[in-house]
């Protein structure tokens, strides 16, 4: 029996059946309370490289985050143990990896951000004071990822007026054809005079020097870029995709990333403004996967196929250089977030993605035929529901903060209001149910305040959810209300939904109690009611309090 997902375009998406699936990192296992930000690439020797953050808590930079790597020498069947690439110390951390392979030299680059007191929104212009600058760093390896050296690129890339600056996590590219063949290109996100922009950093000397191309601002719809990826087309042009809502944005460069056309929406790829990926189907230049002249225009994309919620990670195929995306496979039907896709040396498609409220980072190897077969044999369209539709997913888990924070070494606080015009719920992952200040403490302080690192849950841990009720019908729905055990009920008052409208719930949160821990399992039930209770929809979550496992139905 084939299972399908009802997409926002009323298409039925077949479920992917991976040849291999491995959980490479699990919250609370192997020394970290949190893992995030998957990056994936294949080296010139055919080694699969999976990089990600090892975090002392959920918070984005600044935070004493470590850069981690796992390698596979057999197309993802088995994996080496987790290795440290770069270690955060004091308040300084290194995060958001992006992998780029120079197929000519074999050198592997791992771009990342570095920060001590400031992240993207708090950073100052210029290069001083160093602790208040968000730095653009790169680590590189000449022995297939075994050992790494580190460089700082901030002075080369940070033009006047730029404050925040970081490499878009996931994967960079090497241009394989055309007048700029051999050029290395890594996408960046930057804050310029209060506006979020994007740009390409590129190198024509195998990574010795780098320069930043022209800035990419809001496109034809007025929506601007954020984390973005590029791919080289068969004629040497570059295609860019950026996270955005309600769908991804695209642009084209004819000069190797120096300048870009205005951003345009990609209706075939709904998106909740989450970091997805873009890659060549044939894997060039690092991978020479089986293909033909026909497939030279084929592209792969991975993202959350939903205009609002981080859920439903879908793998898509374009046969026409990204003009359309007719073939789609559902990789993860529930809570999932960032993803990176690449072609593997054995011809399969590899995806590294976040699952279950950032609890796991998962690698999946999917036979390419499962996706390519959909170009000629597409599944039938699924009917659009006539009544209300209720979606609720686990967004994140935050370790409970004690009533009184105990310092151990350096200490710094970033107020929750420091992002100014930017909604912290949209642009930044921090703990405390997305409502509190970001407390920066050393690794030692976090161990002292959060306690031992375990895969299960503790009293005070915060479970944050995101949800939505939409009305695809023809009649209004009155008194639409979210019921559940969340402590912030007042944030979600009853509402009326006219046909075609929706209401979002970001983020109903539940704090685990000591009495919860007397049981082995915690169940949380959310109910959406409408029309005076005549309409009821439920979503139940089950948390194994010892192992950390999450299930939803």
How should these model regions be labeled?
Residues 383-553:
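Exported/extracytosolic protein signature
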Residues 4-383:
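Asp-box/BNR beta-propeller blade signature and adjacent active/binding-site loops
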Residues 1-6, 552:
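Enriched but not universal
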């Amino acid at each position: 029996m084939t299972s399908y997902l009802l997409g926002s375009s009323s298409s039925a998406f077949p479920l992917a059946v991976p040849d291999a699936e491995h959980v490479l990192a699990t919250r609370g296992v192997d020394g970290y309370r949190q893992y995030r930000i998957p990056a994936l690439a294949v080296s010139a020797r055919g080694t699969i490289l999976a990089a990600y953050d090892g975090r002392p808590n959920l918070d984005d930079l600044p935070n004493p985050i470590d850069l981690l790597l796992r390698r596979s020498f057999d197309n993802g069947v088995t994996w080496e143990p987790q290795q440290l690439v770069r270690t955060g110390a004091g308040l300084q951390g290194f995060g958001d990896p992006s992998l780029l392979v120079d197929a000519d030299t074999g050198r592997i680059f791992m771009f990342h951000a570095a920060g001590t007191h400031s992240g993207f929104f708090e950073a100052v212009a210029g290069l001083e004071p160093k602790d208040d600058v968000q730095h653009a760093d790169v680590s590189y390896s000449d022995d297939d990822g075994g050992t790494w050296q580190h460089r700082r690129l901030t002075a080369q890339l940070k033009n006047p007026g730029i404050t925040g600056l970081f490499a878009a996590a996931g994967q960079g590219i090497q241009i394989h054809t055309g007048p700029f063949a051999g050029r290395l290109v890594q996408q960046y996100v930057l804050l310029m005079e209060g506006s979020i922009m994007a740009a390409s950093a590129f190198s024509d000397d195998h990574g010795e020097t780098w320069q930043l191309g022209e800035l990419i601002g809001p496109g034809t719809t007025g929506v601007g870029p954020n984390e973005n990826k590029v791919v080289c087309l068969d004629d040497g042009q570059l295609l860019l995709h950026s996270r955005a809502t309600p769908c991804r944005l695209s642009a084209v460069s004819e000069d190797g990333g120096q300048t870009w056309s205005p951003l345009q929406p990609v209706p075939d790829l709904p998106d909740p403004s989450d970091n997805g990926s873009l890659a060549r189907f044939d894997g060039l230049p690092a991978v020479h996967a089986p293909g033909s002249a026909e497939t030279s225009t084929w592209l792969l994309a991975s993202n959350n196929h939903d205009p609002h919620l981080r859920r439903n990670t879908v793998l898509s195929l374009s046969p026409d250089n990204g003009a359309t995306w007719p073939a789609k496979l559902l990789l993860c039907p529930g809570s999932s977030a960032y993803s990176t896709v690449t072609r593997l040396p054995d011809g399969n498609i590899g995806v590294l993605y976040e699952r279950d409220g950032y609890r796991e980072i998962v690698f999946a190897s999917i036979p390419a035929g499962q996706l390519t077969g959909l170009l000629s044999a597409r599944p039938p369209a699924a009917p659009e529901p006539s009544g209300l539709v209720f979606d609720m997913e686990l967004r994140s888990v935050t370790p409970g903060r004690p009533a009184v924070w105990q310092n151990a070494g350096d200490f710094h606080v970033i107020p929750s209001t420091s992002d100014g015009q930017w909604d912290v719920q949209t642009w930044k992952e921090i703990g405390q149910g997305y409502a509190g200040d970001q407390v920066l403490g050393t690794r030692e302080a976090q161990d002292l305040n959060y306690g031992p690192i375990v895969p299960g849950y503790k009293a005070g841990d915060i479970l944050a959810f995101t949800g939505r009720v939409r009305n695809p019908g023809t009649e209004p729905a009155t008194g639409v209300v979210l019921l559940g055990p969340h402590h912030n009920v007042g944030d979600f008052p009853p509402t009326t939904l006219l046909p075609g409208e929706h209401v979002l719930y970001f983020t109903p949160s539940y704090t685990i109690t000591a009495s919860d821990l007397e049981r082995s399992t915690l169940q949380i039930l959310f109910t959406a009611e409408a029309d005076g209770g005549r309409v009821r929809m439920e979503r139940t979550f089950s948390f194994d309090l010892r192992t950390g496992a999450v299930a939803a139905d």
